[in-house]
Amino acid sequence: MTDSVVRGFEDELSFIEKIDSVRYRVKKGFVPNMNVDGMIYVNDSIKDYLYEELEQYSKRGVSGFLPAVKQIANVASLPGIVGHSLGMPDIHSGYGFSIGNVAAFDTEDPLSIVSPGGVGFDINCGVRLLRTNLTEKDIEPIKEQLCQSLFDHVPVGVGSKGVIPMNIKTLNQALEMGVDWSLGEGYAWVEDKEHCEEYGRMLNADPTKVSERAKKRGLPQLGTLGAGNHYLEVQVVDEIYDKAAANKMGIDRQGQICIMIHSGSRGLGHQVATDSLTLMEKAMARDHIHLNDKQLACSRINSTEGQDYLSGMAAAANFAWVNRQSMTFLTRQAFAKAFNSTPDDLDMHVIYDVSHNIAKFEEHNVNGRPKKLLVHRKGATRAFAPHHPLIPVDYQFTGQPVLIGGTMGTCSYVLTGTELGMNETFGSTCHGAGRSCSRNKSRNNLSYTDVLDSLQAKGISIRVASPKLVMEEAPESYKDVVQVIETCHKAGISKKSVKLRPIAVIKG
């Protein structure tokens, strides 16, 4: 049942304690049955968004999703949670879990749960960054042609269909093998998988746990960008903060061209989440799981429903990695054609590929001893520290690259993981700017022609499949990504490395 405790705003604030300039504790008692405190990483300007949302809720009660602070607290009431229920600076309300929520559950506790709402509907929505040996001066004379070539090569938009040949047999292989399938089919370079989180393949994936309906939705969508906040951007290295880390990534100068691909598991992942939520809602009564919010539907990790979800989620995650790999292949083709060269000669190597929506078994220290945890990251990015065994050899001394997409027309960032982040946030940080208003409000308040004109005024070439959806993704709809990045940097949970400025945007 949805949390029914509605207090006055000042009473609500009495449960929120400022620890320092970027940390706020949400104390037990804020909602019923909290097992741990919440911890939210925000500075003063971002905090105002959360407080305003909470104040509106205090006056009017539930309308749509609960406020993000309430959602952080409700997650803190879930069985088996350890540490804190964590909110990153780009936090905003979502389905069950807020977007920007990180929560870890002790696998030794038989009551611990897995929740699809803690991963999200777009399983393994994530970002990939490629570098090149090109500069902005190389791009400028043919920028419009390149933009059009990318738009022509990479299928975009709500109903877009992929150009990668796929049948149900090869789909099942892709669901099981991830980027290993792409490698076997000639869509990947050997070193591409080395620079992917999980090496582009979750080994617990089981295609039989993905419904026929989900497969039917995913079959035509492999190698497609989709719509919403997904994009392909040509970017310029605008600033280098950490030369050693940047050099390890193959970024060695301002003006260098990179390409960022932001996409996920499309309709297949959405259906996996929907199917699991339906099954878990039925299983909760059997397992005597009582929730503050029914959107937190979950199952014990070791239950049939929990294991089936994790296997299906892993398969959907593999689909997303194959999807980004397929678009990498198409992007390399577009650049090679535009510059009458080869992707290899253009040095189009993958810097890294990260997931923003996923649940994974990881080992972390809890109260001074190592524990195997199921870490849910929803709208958050893994950010492992230097010397961690799960990051590539190339990044052992600098920490894992963390890819943070800005809003349409604003800068993106590459960060690196830190030891403090390992200790405080289970090696996690932010994932983007984070919405500041709803899609509906954006559509009502903004004109798509104004948004497109604004991008062109900044010298950004753009191709959009659905121009009228552009308002939803306008910078005005989001928090300031600079504030988000600076908050994470100041908190020490990730470290700034590179700033990237967009010069061409492809959107659905």
Curated annotation (Swiss-Prot):
<feature type="binding site">
    <location>
        <position position="122"/>
    </location>
    <ligand>
        <name>Mn(2+) 1</name>
    </ligand>
</feature>
<keyword id="KW-0436">Ligase</keyword>
<feature type="binding site">
    <location>
        <begin position="405"/>
        <end position="408"/>
    </location>
    <ligand>
        <name>GMP</name>
    </ligand>
</feature>
<keyword id="KW-0464">Manganese</keyword>
<keyword id="KW-0342">GTP-binding</keyword>
<feature type="binding site">
    <location>
        <position position="125"/>
    </location>
    <ligand>
        <name>Mn(2+) 1</name>
    </ligand>
</feature>
<comment type="function">
    <text>Catalytic subunit of the tRNA-splicing ligase complex that acts by directly joining spliced tRNA halves to mature-sized tRNAs by incorporating the precursor-derived splice junction phosphate into the mature tRNA as a canonical 3',5'-phosphodiester. May act as an RNA ligase with broad substrate specificity, and may function toward other RNAs.</text>
</comment>
<keyword id="KW-0479">Metal-binding</keyword>
<dbReference type="GO" id="GO:0009617">
    <property type="term" value="P:response to bacterium"/>
</dbReference>
<feature type="active site" description="GMP-histidine intermediate">
    <location>
        <position position="431"/>
    </location>
</feature>
<feature type="binding site">
    <location>
        <position position="125"/>
    </location>
    <ligand>
        <name>Mn(2+) 2</name>
    </ligand>
</feature>
<dbReference type="GO" id="GO:0046872">
    <property type="term" value="F:metal ion binding"/>
</dbReference>
<feature type="binding site">
    <location>
        <position position="507"/>
    </location>
    <ligand>
        <name>GMP</name>
    </ligand>
</feature>
<dbReference type="GO" id="GO:0170057">
    <property type="term" value="F:RNA ligase (GTP) activity"/>
</dbReference>
<comment type="similarity">
    <text>Belongs to the RtcB family.</text>
</comment>
<keyword id="KW-0819">tRNA processing</keyword>
<keyword id="KW-0547">Nucleotide-binding</keyword>
<dbReference type="GO" id="GO:0005525">
    <property type="term" value="F:GTP binding"/>
</dbReference>
<comment type="subunit">
    <text>Catalytic component of the tRNA-splicing ligase complex.</text>
</comment>
<dbReference type="GO" id="GO:0006388">
    <property type="term" value="P:tRNA splicing, via endonucleolytic cleavage and ligation"/>
</dbReference>
<dbReference type="GO" id="GO:0005634">
    <property type="term" value="C:nucleus"/>
</dbReference>
<feature type="binding site">
    <location>
        <position position="230"/>
    </location>
    <ligand>
        <name>Mn(2+) 1</name>
    </ligand>
</feature>
<dbReference type="Pfam" id="PF01139">
    <property type="entry name" value="RtcB"/>
</dbReference>
<feature type="binding site">
    <location>
        <position position="262"/>
    </location>
    <ligand>
        <name>Mn(2+) 2</name>
    </ligand>
</feature>
<feature type="binding site">
    <location>
        <begin position="229"/>
        <end position="233"/>
    </location>
    <ligand>
        <name>GMP</name>
    </ligand>
</feature>
<feature type="binding site">
    <location>
        <position position="412"/>
    </location>
    <ligand>
        <name>GMP</name>
    </ligand>
</feature>
<dbReference type="InterPro" id="IPR027513">
    <property type="entry name" value="RtcB_euk"/>
</dbReference>
<dbReference type="InterPro" id="IPR001233">
    <property type="entry name" value="RtcB"/>
</dbReference>
<feature type="binding site">
    <location>
        <begin position="356"/>
        <end position="357"/>
    </location>
    <ligand>
        <name>GMP</name>
    </ligand>
</feature>
<feature type="binding site">
    <location>
        <begin position="431"/>
        <end position="434"/>
    </location>
    <ligand>
        <name>GMP</name>
    </ligand>
</feature>
<dbReference type="InterPro" id="IPR036025">
    <property type="entry name" value="RtcB-like_sf"/>
</dbReference>
<feature type="binding site">
    <location>
        <position position="356"/>
    </location>
    <ligand>
        <name>Mn(2+) 2</name>
    </ligand>
</feature>
<protein>
    <recommendedName>
        <fullName>RNA-splicing ligase RtcB homolog</fullName>
        <ecNumber>6.5.1.8</ecNumber>
    </recommendedName>
</protein>
<dbReference type="GO" id="GO:0072669">
    <property type="term" value="C:tRNA-splicing ligase complex"/>
</dbReference>
